[in-house]
Amino acid sequence: LRTAVDCLTLTATPIPRTLQFSLIGARDLSIMNTPPPNRQPIQTEVQVYNEDFIREAIYFETERGGQVFFIYNRIAGLAEMAAIIQGLCPDLSIGFAHGQMDGHLLEERIFDFIDRKYDVLVSTNIVESGVDIPNVNTIIVNNAHQFGLSDLHQLRGRVGRSNKKAFCYLLAPPMSTLPNDSKKRLQTLEQHSELGSGFQIAMRDLDIRGAGNMLGGEQSGFMAEIGFEMYQKILDEAIRELKRTEFKELFKEEIAKQDDFVQDCTIDTDLEILIPDDY
């Protein structure tokens, strides 16, 4: 950290627009790749909803002394989903929690889960941030195709917070029935399950969603006429100029390095370099 930094943003997976600001140089970017000691990668699998599989995954975790998150992101059917899980695992204690519960009741439910009064907590994605329960090492996300990539990565981060092997199961309809974007999101989570993969996931999210509607009809100005590549070049030049004028004290080290390299190269020659007639 430097005293010259006025605002520091910390994120596991930057949203595409924020990431784009860093990639074009409008914001500095630092990546922390070193995980806490003794952490293991979270085994991530995409599965079709199957009650036998759910029962097996829950009992595998509870029999080794752990607990389970079951994510169901519809408040209206949350109690019914908890009843289904209770029917699958009648000898286990099942609780449920969501954001519209009374604050005291919600807090009590979470603390009861931390105190191991429940084996399984059926919850909305309210638990995706700020929850650190090392004994929970299996998370099952129902209808995972309806979640965004960053949401799924945050939910997966609720497990594997100790030295135990953790599991994340993403339940979704068969891949062949899903839209392309949903399919890409699930495949990305399954492929990038190693520690410190948040940046790769964010880059894939940028690739899937784009950095914003740059050339759409809502945009004003002349960008649609000059094209995206020229726009990026003009934007890059404007950022470099600002760094050398208004913010030169902040970026003096970067400017010194840039001065050692040629940014653009112009060749002036008498030779004719044209596309041949027979092309």
Where are the regions a protein language model picked out?
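Post-DEXD/H (motif II) to motif III coupling segment of the RecA-like Helicase ATP-binding lobe
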Residues: L1-Q67
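C-terminal helicase module of SF1/SF2 nucleic-acid helicases/translocases
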Residues: T9, E51-F69, N73, G77-E80, ...
